[in-house]
């Protein structure tokens, strides 16, 4: 199984890339994280948020690994604790499907994509920069893995 993070946005500051890389390099070979950046659509010329999200949805769908479990990150998604994520990981690994975490653009994710997702998950009740969400998600995936391995990184 491979973990994918599909994120609308590119040209992130160096500290975002450094933070993200720090956690992805810690992951074991059997649970690698791959980032796929999706170029955001321009919201110019009176273009509606709906048309921007629909265009971004098409790009996201083209980048999704075939057959992957889709976990869409959304402010109205389910609140999971780190322990719940850690409990989900072994089941996902046994099922063998890749898992694609999807981070939307400035306007969020298209409703069609959210409806198609296997899980809607909220990272935080606070509004966060999308680049920071990449770092937080990578850290939480590493922490969840460390819990499943009784690794000392996580101290409950």
From Swiss-Prot:
Q: Which InterPro entries match?
A: Alpha/beta_knot_MTases (IPR029028), RlmH-like (IPR003742), tRNA_m1G_MTases_N (IPR029026)
Tell me how this protein assembles: Homodimer.
To which protein family does this belong?
Answer: Belongs to the RNA methyltransferase RlmH family.
UniProt catalytic activity? pseudouridine(1915) in 23S rRNA + S-adenosyl-L-methionine = N(3)-methylpseudouridine(1915) in 23S rRNA + S-adenosyl-L-homocysteine + H(+)
Q: List the disulfide bonds.
A: none
Q: Which Enzyme Commission number(s) are on file for it?
A: 2.1.1.177
Q: Which residues bind S-adenosyl-L-methionine?
A: 73, 104, 123-128
A GO cellular component entry from the record:
cytoplasm
GO molecular function per UniProt: rRNA (pseudouridine-N3-)-methyltransferase activity
Q: What class of enzyme is it?
A: transferase
Q: Tell me which species this is from.
A: Burkholderia vietnamiensis (strain G4 / LMG 22486) (Burkholderia cepacia (strain R1808))
UniProt-listed Gene3D superfamilies: 3.40.1280.10
Q: What is this protein called?
A: Ribosomal RNA large subunit methyltransferase H
* Alphabetized UniProt keyword annotations: Cytoplasm, Methyltransferase, rRNA processing, S-adenosyl-L-methionine, Transferase
Where does the record place it? Answer: Cytoplasm
- Main role? Specifically methylates the pseudouridine at position 1915 (m3Psi1915) in 23S rRNA.
Mind telling me which SUPFAM superfamilies this protein's record contains? alpha/beta knot
